[in-house]
Amino acid sequence: MRTKNNHALIAGTVTSAPTAYMCCGERFWSFELTVMRQSGAADTLEVNCPQLVLETVETGDKLCLEGQVRSYAKTIDGKSRLSVALFALKVQEHKADCNEVELEGYLCEKPEFRTTPRGRDICYAMLAVNRERGKSDYIPQVFWGRTAKRVSEMQVGTQISLSGRLQSRSYTKKNATRTVFEVSVGKVSEGGSNDA
């Protein structure tokens, strides 16, 4: 179930009680999937999955899901916020945790470059990834090192292909802890080659 410009293969353990919901006359599951990195750190990701793809799901299940990274508008504390989740299209046999994302899209905001207090170059960017039927997903990206500098010099509207992992990152702002979901990019190329 590979799509040209948005593909994800993510395997991990279900760590929240699944909730069922209806959308457009179809029944879906929503749950959190925790994926271990090689470093030992963990990413806890949101998953939406049609029940046609996965009939039942329980906390503790080990799943390997193939699908797309999608963005949704979600109301949190009375404000509309961008929510990023894996939309599962296929279930595969779970062998080991993995987190692989390939995207092709367009920079839709000016990339934001900075150097961390530890001296590491970092660049945040928003990628618009087109879907069928004229819709787009807006997916936050984070680039590192020389790649961060290179991307920071790109213009809004530049088409790029990339590969990386979908990660969760928590931070504190105004005494409240928030979690963001973004793609930590490992490889990037300019243009629509999808050879990231």
Task: Please give the residue ranges for each predicted region.
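Single-stranded nucleic acid-binding surfaces, predominantly the OB-fold ssDNA-binding core
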Residues: 1-196
